[in-house]
Amino acid sequence: TGNLHVGGARTALFNYLFARSRGGKFVLRVEDTDLERSTKKSEEAVLSDLSWLGLDWDEGPDIGGDFGPYRQSERNALYKEHAQKLMESGAVYRCFCSSEELEKMKVTANQMKIPPVYMGKWATASDAEVQQELEKGTPYTYRFRVPKEGSLKINDLIRGEVSWNLNTLGDFVIMRSNGQPVYNFCVTVDDATMRISHVIRAEEHLPNTLRQALIYKALGFAMPLFAHVSLILAPDKSKLSKRHGATSVGQYKEMGYLPQAMVNYLALLGWGDGTENEFFTIDDLVEKFTINRVNKSGAVFDATKLKWMNGQHLRSLPSDLLIKDFEDRWRSTGILLESESGFAKEAAELLKEGIDLITDADAALCKLLSYPLHDTLSSDEAKSVVEDKLSEVASGLIAAYDSGELGQALAEGHDGWKKWVKSFGKTHKRKVSVIEGDCGLILLPTEGLFLGCFNGLAKPLEHLN
């Protein structure tokens, strides 16, 4: 249901990295037992977001596999088969309690200040009592018999030993009165029949492990190894939610984030390789990922750092890989009608140094192409600069452009450009600096003046002579 939350994406990433690092298989299963809320649109969106992140799966609903089908809604026959096995073994029983009776039990438990466990009679009902209700057509659920004493322990790969007292659980439902299996029963049957060896999931599923462990044992299945990762927190240390801003992978994709940056950042939410390095490709992560380096404590989602990291990844990309993204955006917004002269490549090389998101390129290009040069030159702030032999500086810039010196500086990237600007300023006895993101030129003695940028630099400067 819904969209792929960044928390779900991180969980998928950890499963992917673990499987790839161990030579295992990464399985995608669609858990759509909530028929009222589950939609095909949501499924397609989740699969699309996982693909965008580069998390390719080995088995799944779209590609099949040896243990399909991979949608829970298509596995009902299997669930009913195993529910019947539990019924025949006496591990479950039919419960004919009405919703009103169950509500009274909750009220009583609350008054007695005890866990709201099932206290109905059907766990010990006679065959005759059960048959009587069946003949009357009374709706019933399947309840699992939980031992009333003892405890259950598991060794979580992240949290270590975790235990529960069985008397806090009570008999729980595995099949609803409408014949639909509940989540805990489905995933147990699925993990067992699909031969899942490891389950890495969010810590909010930890309480479910108790029910699932009991079902595994009753069915005679070996239990997979579990690893429960901490929740992703907002800056205020509460659970990350929509009120904190964007939370889905799709939203970040639309905002102009790169998939490799998202993967890099999500991997660092609760994991590290033990060094100070913060930049990893997905291949690096596969090589270095180990479950024992995943932290127990919650990880804070820092949108500012994610944006910074995205900018670092963007600047490391060859411009050729950005051209299509830029051209597609500029054509869709009407900024660019056609490009046959290498304009997009030049623009990508120039702009990527000063932006953090793909979407920032729109405003950056508009700013670059529509800079109000003449208004700036005629302003009071520019007066002292213009009167201080500006035409000589302009002539020097035009000469540098005509000789190819300026083009060579641009070809050397942002660092090369900054070096050339400083050298030019020294030659003309001006204090010079570069505007980050605008690739512009400031000549001071006192106030800053943007003179131009990009390969069209000569045209506006010609008017200064």
Q: What are the roles of these predicted feature ranges?
A:
Residues 1, 28-32, 194-199, 247, ...:
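Glycine- and acidic
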Residues 1-112, 207-221, 261:
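N-terminal Rossmann-like or analogous alpha/beta NTP/dinucleotide-binding catalytic cores
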Residues 20, 51, 87-88, 217, ...:
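Short polybasic/polar patches that bind polyanions
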